[in-house]
């Protein structure tokens, strides 16, 4: 018996049901890698960031997330080179979906009890996504803007419902606006730290400020 189609589990009807000591025997999620490309690139190398944003409250299967990840990665490698971008899948499939298996062979009515004891066995995992939640993000160089939009457009076809592509005003994966990012780095208000930054507040011990500006 094959896998039940994901359209049967599209809508968020029940409470979140994660894997736990009460919910055992859950199959592994299909998606295992959430960061692709040049993920160790410094924060100042990839200023442009594009997001795929959900426009529906629904459930996305781990198989769909894996298919979208592969699709976006393949296009970005072809168009920008394998070291020209960093993709991050922002959803993790923690919600367990169940199936109450029904026999369809002859004499099945003697072997099974129908809807008596119908609480199913774990079948797979899905990610619950809200309206306005980011599904996938890509950071890259400024000249690759069209390639980011096309990669996310192709990945959209792997999901049900409606998604929007949004080019962020922030610098890379940080929460700081691109137009003031470089000024803050020059003023030592932000310190680059891998693919993110450390924010140095104006208040605090004076010796910390002296150590930074010495």
Curated annotation (Swiss-Prot):
| GO molecular function (one) | structural constituent of ribosome
**Null mutant: what phenotype?**
Spermatogenic failure and male infertility. Spermatocytes show defects in the transition from prophase to metaphase of meiosis I due to impaired ribosome biogenesis in late prophase spermatocytes.
Q: Which GO terms describe its biological process?
A: cell differentiation; male meiosis I; ribosomal large subunit assembly; spermatogenesis; translation
Please provide one cellular component term from the Gene Ontology annotations of this protein.
cytosolic large ribosomal subunit
UniProt xrefs under InterPro entries: Ribosomal_uL16, Ribosomal_uL16_CS_euk_arc, Ribosomal_uL16_dom, Ribosomal_uL16_euk_arch, Ribosomal_uL16_sf
Which keywords has UniProt assigned to this entry?
Cytoplasm, Differentiation, Meiosis, Ribonucleoprotein, Ribosomal protein, Spermatogenesis
Q: What is its main location?
A: cytoplasm
Q: Which body tissues produce this protein?
A: Testis-specific.
Q: List the subcellular locations.
A: Cytoplasm
Q: What are the coiled-coil residue ranges?
A: none
What CDD domains does the database record attribute to this sequence?
Ribosomal_L16_L10e
* Record function comment: Testis-specific component of the ribosome, which is required for the transition from prophase to metaphase in male meiosis I. Compensates for the inactivated X-linked RPL10 paralog during spermatogenesis. The ribosome is a large ribonucleoprotein complex responsible for the synthesis of proteins in the cell. The male germ cell-specific ribosome displays a ribosomal polypeptide exit tunnel of distinct size and charge states compared with the classical ribosome.
Q: Which family does it belong to?
A: Belongs to the universal ribosomal protein uL16 family.
Please describe the quaternary structure of this protein. Component of a male germ cell-specific 60S large ribosomal subunit (LSU), which contains RPL10L and RPL39L, instead of RPL10 and RPL39 paralogs. The composition of the rest of the complex is similar to classical ribosomes.
Q: What is this protein called?
A: Large ribosomal subunit protein uL16-like
Q: Please give the organism.
A: Mus musculus (Mouse)
Kindly list the organism's lineage.
Answer: Eukaryota, Metazoa, Chordata, Craniata, Vertebrata
């Amino acid at each position: 018996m094959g896998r039940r189609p994901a359209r049967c589990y599209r809508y968020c009807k029940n409470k979140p049901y994660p894997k736990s000591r009460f919910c055992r025997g859950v199959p592994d999620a299909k998606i295992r890698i959430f960061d692709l490309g040049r993920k160790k690139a410094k924060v100042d190398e990839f200023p442009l960031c594009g997001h795929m944003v959900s426009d529906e409250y629904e459930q996305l299967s781990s198989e769909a997330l894996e298919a979208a990840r592969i699709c976006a990665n393949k296009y970005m490698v072809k168009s920008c080179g394998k070291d020209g971008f960093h993709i991050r899948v922002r959803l993790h499939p923690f919600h367990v979906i169940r199936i109450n298996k029904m026999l369809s062979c002859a004499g099945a009515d003697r072997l099974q009890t129908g809807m008596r004891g119908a609480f199913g066995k774990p079948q797979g995992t899905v990610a619950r996504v809200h309206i306005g939640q980011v599904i996938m993000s890509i950071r890259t160089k400024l000249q690759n803007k069209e390639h980011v939009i096309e990669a996310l457009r192709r990945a959209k076809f792997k999901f049900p419902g409606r998604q929007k592509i949004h080019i962020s005003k922030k610098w890379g994966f940080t929460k700081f606006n691109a137009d003031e990012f470089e000024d803050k780095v020059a003023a030592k208000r932000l310190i680059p730290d891998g693919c993110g930054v450390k924010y140095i507040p104006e208040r605090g011990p004076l010796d910390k400020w002296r150590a930074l500006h010495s």
